[in-house]
Amino acid sequence: MEPACKYDFATSVLFTEAELHTRMRGVAQRIADDYSNCNLKPLENPLVIVSVLKGSFVFTADMVRILGDFGVPTRVEFLRASSYGHDTKSCGRVDVKADGLCDIRGKHVLVLEDILDTALTLREVVDSLKKSEPASIKTLVAIDKPGGRKIPFTAEYVVADVPNVFVVGYGLDYDQSYREVRDVVILKPSVYETWGKELERRKAAGEAKR
């Protein structure tokens, strides 16, 4: 019999923060090896990290420091992209906002995403960035959910795989909540079912979302 989950909103913990960090160090070693001939240097030629907000902020903060442990200099940039609303499934529409991104022409770019699910968001992000003609562009995802694909896409680097369930924690959210949870957990269906009904009730009553 499995022990009870320590989170009352989750059915189980898939990966603890410590387990993720161990896996991230393994990925960082691979990245350091793969870019060893790219002459990466602070200021002159850092690896440009493009973090996809909002979900990747926790992952990015940890990953760039771990990359630093392996001698990989980085510059961090952010863009906003989303294909989820209040639901647990992608709505299929991708909104990418990359205003203010540095000039990546001729630079080595590594896109960091919290979760690779349908692949619609990451495909749109990569295609958008390629227009700026970087020297190279690769993707690193904290969580890969292969069962959720709507289009073919393979990330060059993956920290952990999960089954086709809805997960939160370590920056991953459900309707902007649960990002602060340190571990990656499976959200109880009762949570999003109840909240979905509440949103419908408020909509019908003409109430603003709190």
Swiss-Prot record:
InterPro entries per record: HGPRT, Hxn_phspho_trans, PRibTrfase_dom, PRTase-like
Manganese is among the record's keywords: no
SUPFAM superfamilies associated with the record: PRTase-like
Alphabetized PROSITE patterns for the sequence: PUR_PYR_PR_TRANSFER
UniProt binding sites for Mg(2+): D173
Biological-process GO terms, alphabetical: GMP salvage; guanine salvage; hypoxanthine metabolic process; IMP salvage; purine ribonucleoside salvage
Catalytic activity: IMP + diphosphate = hypoxanthine + 5-phospho-alpha-D-ribose 1-diphosphate; GMP + diphosphate = guanine + 5-phospho-alpha-D-ribose 1-diphosphate
E.C. no: 2.4.2.8
Subcellular location: Cytoplasm
Entry similarity comment: Belongs to the purine/pyrimidine phosphoribosyltransferase family.
Record-given protein name: Hypoxanthine-guanine phosphoribosyltransferase
Source organism (scientific name): Trypanosoma brucei brucei
Organism lineage: Eukaryota, Discoba, Euglenozoa, Kinetoplastea, Metakinetoplastina
Gene encoding the protein: HGPRT
